[in-house]
Amino acid sequence: MSTRYLSGSAVALVTPFKKDMTVDTDALRRLVQFQIAAGTDIIIPCGTTGESPTLSEDEQFDIIRIVKDEVDGKALVAAGAGTNSTPHAVALAKNAVKAGASLLLSVAPYYNKPSQEGIYQHYRHIAEAVTVPIIIYNVPGRTGCNVAASTILRLARDFENIAAVKEATENMSQISELLEERPDHFSVLTGEDSLILPFMAMGGDGVISVAANQIPSQIKQLVEAARLGDLEEARRINRRYRKLLKLNFIESNPVPVKYALSRMGMIEENYRLPLVPLSAENKLLIDQELESLGLI
């Protein structure tokens, strides 16, 4: 991979469940078709928004396979495949590739609180175990550790299949360093919907978005407008959907976005424990915003 090719709008796809808590495969296929119709560039099942900690390896395999089948070459499929045990993360990566993933999203090892060298070695083992491109997922608000820019850049330079980072932080200094120092093949994607506009203005490559579950066309348009330098249009889109982007995190992701999708008639509102439904107060706030935007 001598050139950068991960860019645009990616969706961190929810996992729909039936009332009996099995995966709703019919709803999953509908969600994928909704993304394809909107022109989403990358579809990512089995990540944080997909409730991956509650999915068995067999379920993850089946979800990735269904998404890959439904996409039918119209987008890239990047599977969430990470955990805090390096051997297990390698096994998840191999499982995702076997299921048909075109690339992998691998979360930084959480809870263990590894050193930067430990993080480097974790990703080294994954990169040496598979040949598909890997997206480092840096989300210190969930993992309890930040993958430093120096570590990300070291990995990108040492392994050609370390292809991108999902930088789910508001650390603009780190983002700036990554954008300025990265090798040619390496993409930098934001994981913060609220930062799409400033991130793209800094030279970012795109977003891995939660809101794209609800408004994939609009997120795609926002990214494209910012990429092309049409800041007036980008600001218009950002202004219109700013409140929704904020409400998606009024409680733990993916609870708000799954509630919104249920109100939009796309999935049933079911979560696997320890996630529970939204409070009545927050449901009302989301209902009001969805109505205001004409989404329900």
UniProtKB/Swiss-Prot annotation:
The record marks 48, 111 as: Part of a proton relay during catalysis. GO terms for molecular function: 4-hydroxy-tetrahydrodipicolinate synthase activity. The active site is at residues 137, 166. Pathway: Amino-acid biosynthesis; L-lysine biosynthesis via DAP pathway; (S)-tetrahydrodipicolinate from L-aspartate: step 3/4. The keyword Chloroplast does not apply. HAMAP family: DapA. This is 4-hydroxy-tetrahydrodipicolinate synthase. The lineage of its organism: Bacteria, Pseudomonadati, Chlorobiota, Chlorobiia, Chlorobiales. The gene is dapA.
